[in-house]
Amino acid sequence: MVYDIAGLRVFIDNKYPYTTKFCTKYLSEDQDAGVDIHATVTEEEFAEEKACSLNFSDGYIENICLYRSICAQMPLFNRILLHAAIIEYDGKAYAFLGRSGTGKSTHTRLWMKHIDGVKFINGDKPILEYKDNQFIAYGTPWMGKEGLGEKTQAPLCGLCFLEQAPENSIKRMTAAETSARLFTQILLPKEEENVVSTLDFLDKMILELPSYLLKCTISEEAVQKSFEALTGKQYISKNI
C-alpha cells in the first residue's frame, strides 16, 4: 500500500497486518501514481531484529524494520529522522530532546496542561525536512508508546535538550554543545551518500536553529523557562 508520509509517497511492502492498521491515517488516496520510497524488510533484517525483541509480535518487529528502511532513504529527499518529542504552538514547532527517561513526554505534556493552543506533532520519531531555508517537522505514524501526534506539519523553530535536575535553569547552547547532543538523536544511514547528506543536514540544524539546555524538575516553572526561551514570549498559564 502507498502512504503519504512527510510529504512523500511511500510504498510499504509489509507481510503482517500490524503495519496496515498502524498506518491507516496516512493511507494515500492515490494508490496508482509513482512512489518516492519503497520500504521492505529482508529476512536477515527481520531475524536480526527479532533476536533483540523476543517478547514482541512478528508484526511489531516488521513494523520497526519498515520504519528503519523508510528513514534510511529519507536523506535522498533532504529529510531525516529525529528522536524527539515535537509540539506546535502558534503555528511553530519546537523539539524536545534527551536520552530515554529524561522526561520528554512528561515535559511536553506539561506544556499542553499549562499553555493554551499546544498540540503534539509527534511524541517520539518525527521526520524533519529542510526546504526553502527552513526546517519542517512532520508527524508520522511512529509516535512512541504514548501515541502522541497528528498527521500535520509546522516549521521547526527551536531545540530544547532536557536534563533532570533538582532546580530549573535554562541556557543557550553553543554550536559545539548542540553538535555533541544532537548527533545521538538521529539515525545514521549505512550508505555513504546518505551519511554525507545527513551530516550536512545536521550542520544546518546546528547553525540555523536556536538550541537550549533545560535542567528541570517536573513543574510549571520548568514549562515557563522553556516556553519563554523558545518562543520569546511572556509565559501566561491557562490555569490563571
What kind of region is each of these model predictions?
Residues 1-100, 110-121, 127-240:
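A noncatalytic interaction/capping subdomain that flanks phosphate/NTP-handling catalytic cores
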